[in-house]
Amino acid sequence: VRGGWVESGPLDDESRIDRAAAGRVVLRLGRMLRPQRRAILRAVFLLIFQTAALLASPLVVRYAVDAGLVGKSGRAINIAAVVYLILAVTSALLGRSVIWAVSRIGEDFLRSLRARVFRHLINLDLGFFEREKTGRLVARMTSDIDALQELVSQGLVMFVQNALIFVGTLVVMSLLSWQLTLCTIIVVPPVIFASLWFRKRSNTAYLEVRDRVGTNLSTLQEGLEGVRVVQAFGREGGFIERFEETNEAQYDANIATVNIATRYFPFVEFIGVVGLAVVVGAGSYFVDRNILEVGTVLAFVLYLNNLFEPIQQLSQLYNTVQSAAAALNKLFGLLDTPNSVPEKPGAIDLPLAGAMMVSGVAFAYGGGPPDTDGVSHPLGPIVLNDVSITVAAGERVALVGPTGAGKSTLAKLMARFYDPIEGDVSFGGVSLRDATRRSLRERIAVVPQEGFLFAGTVRDNIRVGSPEASDADVDAAVDALGLREHFESFPEGLDTEVRERGSRLSAGEKQLVSLARAALADPTVLVLDEATSNLDPGTELEVERALEALTQGRTVIVVAHRLSTAQRCDRVAVVADGQILEIGTHDDLVSRGDAYAALFAAWTRTE
């Protein structure tokens, strides 16, 4: 902590993977691209023809010089000019075709990958999302995909084309003159060594820039989001000082990359000039002795650029390939993450009605598969231990107890957000482990503590409970809960836009939408996870009335924060230290004078 501010640490270096991992990524990528192999082959053939056109151009110049200028033939010069123009046009057209073909292949792959990752993510168990940070998952779909985007849109073409140009140039130069080729190769090793140095230094420097940019943006975002607190406590000066420090660090990191670039590129240009001087000097020697013609020497001069530039391009491309390989490795790791609550092969539908039975259940958080960074999470302390309870069809049972007792965990097990490590949870005699996911979600609905709304209208958010429902069905669900008048008071009624996360509505209004959503789903079992604990005074009464209407005729499990809710239930189960201490009606438990009576007395004093 410096100056009252918590300093952000550097970002993890996630842009490098070892060769073995890179090899596995390439093999898996090849398998994923197999359906597009014909398109890839077409793109490769186009690229080969384009490279051939580029490599043929210096040979045309050689012909123009030897046959036209030296041979004093205007016809030869005209032929060379026409052929050179044809090659230039052909190369441009082929280049456009190559870029289009490769871009289509890449974009099709990325579209498929994004969809595949999202489908996998949206179906993973709740425990996965409690282990993983949302920001890290978003990064998988944004920055990691962006790293791949750069590779498929530019990198692949550059890599293949530069490799072809380098090899093709060496072959053509060797065929033209092995003597000048040997003279040229002398200056190649310094360029290669310089490029290897640049690759290593620039990768480290660019990672540092990325870290500093992230820290600077984090500082900026934190300051803007907390500007009220900053101004309220007069901390503008301290925050400005902190931002200036992170901004200066970003500046230093950028200057370091500039320093590396200014040492590498001028050196390579200098070596290119040395190579040119060597070729011209040796060429004039061979021309004087009639070993070579002037056109051949000039062609060599033109080929020199084709020899050095690919080395530079491939060196700069290394970081792009490395980042893309690391991004693919992380995305593949995400795709390989198993679901801890999978649907069994041969799963069966839950019955339409029946009792909810929890039998000898034990549960602890953690112990799932490694996260997307390969970090394992050992099994945590036991949260529930040997818990058994039966909720009859149509019965309303409240789960009460102190914070951290295991109430919400028990409710989540009843909805099969998790599977117990011991014991079983069943509905109508069918284990939830054996049930199809579709029937599980149709029979059991959960209303959480905070109603989450998606961008769209109120009607759209209610329809999440049953996407196929008509407007009339939505209206009927709203009317069944007595919420018509409240929703009609909105500017556009049920068609009012709620914006992202329902920012236009209060907490209570969001919960009303959640209740209407549950009513539209029409479940047999309703799990209310402290659904009345985070309400504003203006909607509290309406939420309670809507809840009363929603729970009629349904099996209800309520995680009760307010004991007034427990009073309205058929039975109350007191949960403490991961066990059910007592269970019975409200009146019976109060008369016993044990745990529930103490909770109720304490709650009564605070109300």
Language model segments and positions:
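Cytosolic ends of transmembrane helices, especially the final helix of ABC transmembrane type-1 domains
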Residues: 235, 259, 276, 306-336
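ABC-type nucleotide-binding domain
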Residues: 350-607
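An intracellular "coupling" helix at the cytosolic face of ABC transporter transmembrane type-1 domains
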Residues: 31, 35-38, 126-127, 143-152, ...
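Alpha-helical segments in transporter systems
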Residues: 27-30, 38-59, 63, 80, ...
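Juxtamembrane loop-to-helix connectors within ABC transporter transmembrane domains
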Residues: 16, 24-27, 33-36, 98, ...
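Transmembrane helix-loop-helix hairpins at lipid-water interfaces of multipass membrane proteins
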Residues: 40-94, 101, 174-179, 290-294
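Transmembrane helices of ABC transporter permease
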Residues: 39-49, 84, 154-208, 279-292, ...
